[in-house]
Amino acid sequence: MELNSIKPGSGSKHAKRRVGRGIGSGLGKTAGRGHKGQKSRAGGYHKVGFEGGQMPLQRRLPKRGFKSHLLKFNAEITLGQLQVLAVDEVDLLLLKQIGLVGELAKVVKVVKSGELTRAVVLKGIGATAGAKAAIEAAGGSLAA
């Protein structure tokens, strides 16, 4: 066997369907589109969501709520993530450098999820009531 004699396995490749190339091909004349009607014409079909003139679903349903753009400035970390960190004093700048919070984050809060067994001092970082109790129980504190 030579490299120039390698061919795909039989049946693994299919020829591209060429429509409108004579009646002998089986896909000539109307090219598989049937006779007349909107879908047989050039220029495509109706828009996505169009319901034939009936009021479309996305306009029948009321608007509801919104997505706050302030969310990108808030971040949260867990007690489990604090446990993994190899530092004793944690502040916002450190969390950004490590990549635990995004660059846009301005407010960070610790939530009670996971275990914390070592003392950690948080500077300028908030905590939920449960997380605060767990941090203080481990010998840590929250500094303003």
UniProtKB/Swiss-Prot annotation:
GO terms for molecular function: rRNA binding; structural constituent of ribosome. GO terms for cellular component: cytosolic large ribosomal subunit. Residues 1-51 are annotated as: Disordered. It holds the Pfam family Ribosomal_L27A. Residues 21-31 have a biased composition (Gly residues). Keywords: Ribonucleoprotein, Ribosomal protein, RNA-binding, rRNA-binding. InterPro entries: Ribosomal_uL15, Ribosomal_uL15/eL18, Ribosomal_uL15/eL18_sf, Ribosomal_uL15_bac-type. Part of the 50S ribosomal subunit. NCBIfam families: rplO_bact. This is Large ribosomal subunit protein uL15.
